[in-house]
């Protein structure tokens, strides 16, 4: 019951409260930049997609922490979720600075990620960790793509995405070291297809 209450609290905080980072944003020490209308529009769309990714990460990690019976794994998942909360706060702060907003479909993204996390975790802890590894690897690749697309002048957004990308790689390595099983190719393809739908939609809505 306590775990379910923690998950419910996480959902409410993720979707309806202003996220509070435990660590200052990498963009905070950088000066404000003057972007053109087109540059601002592109940065806003990309950071909105990144914010959606962090909403999904909260749903995924919370679902998995609810199911596992391994206290150490639960602790590790919750620690990763706290780091993802930093990312959530940083991307939200950057959206605010750009004069933009999060995706209107965040409740849908959170619910979908939570459901997928529950299914993966019920198979086994190793399968659950395998899902984490594949998710973090895909997110890392996606963030690398955003670094190539973000305007060179948008140093604050680039600093945030660069730090997030390094954190996601570390999360994948930690899950792999904890005993993750590799996902079968069909599962990886399905995840990529679902991510494509999410990123394309969040880019606009």
Swiss-Prot record:
Any single biological process term in GO: ubiquinone biosynthetic process
Record GO terms (molecular function): 3-demethoxyubiquinol 3-hydroxylase activity; metal ion binding
Superkingdom classification of source: Bacteria
Pfam families: COQ7 (PF03232)
Localization terms from the record: Cell membrane
Keyword Chloroplast attributed: no
Cofactor note as given: Binds 2 iron ions per subunit.
Residue positions binding Fe cation 2: 84, 136, 168, 171
Membrane-topology annotation of the record: Peripheral membrane protein
Cofactor(s) for this UniProt protein: Fe cation
Cystine bridges: none
InterPro entries: COQ7_proteobact, Ferritin-like, Ferritin-like_SF, Ubq_synth_Coq7
Family from the record: Belongs to the COQ7 family.
Name of the protein in its database record: 3-demethoxyubiquinol 3-hydroxylase
């Amino acid at each position: 019951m306590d775990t379910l209450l923690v998950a419910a609290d996480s959902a409410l905080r993720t979707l309806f409260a202003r996220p509070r980072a435990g660590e200052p944003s990498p963009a905070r020490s950088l000066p404000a930049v003057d972007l053109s209308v087109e540059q601002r529009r592109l940065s806003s769309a990309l950071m909105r997609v990144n914010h959606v990714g962090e909403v999904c990460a909260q749903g995924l990690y919370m679902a998995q922490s609810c199911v596992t019976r391994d206290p150490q794994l639960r602790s590790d998942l919750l620690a990763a979720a706290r780091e993802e909360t930093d990312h959530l706060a940083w991307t939200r702060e950057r959206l605010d600075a750009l004069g933009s907003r999060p995706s209107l479909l965040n409740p849908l993204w959170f619910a979908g990620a939570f459901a997928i996390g529950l299914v993966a975790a019920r198979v086994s802890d190793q399968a659950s960790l395998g899902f984490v590894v594949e998710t973090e690897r895909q997110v890392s690749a996606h963030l690398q793509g955003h670094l190539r697309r973000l305007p060179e002048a948008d140093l604050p957004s680039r600093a945030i995405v660069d730090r997030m990308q390094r954190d996601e790689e570390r999360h994948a390595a930690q899950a792999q070291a904890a005993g993750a099983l590799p996902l079968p190719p069909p599962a990886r393809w399905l995840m990529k297809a679902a991510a494509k739908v999410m990123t394309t939609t969040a880019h606009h809505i």
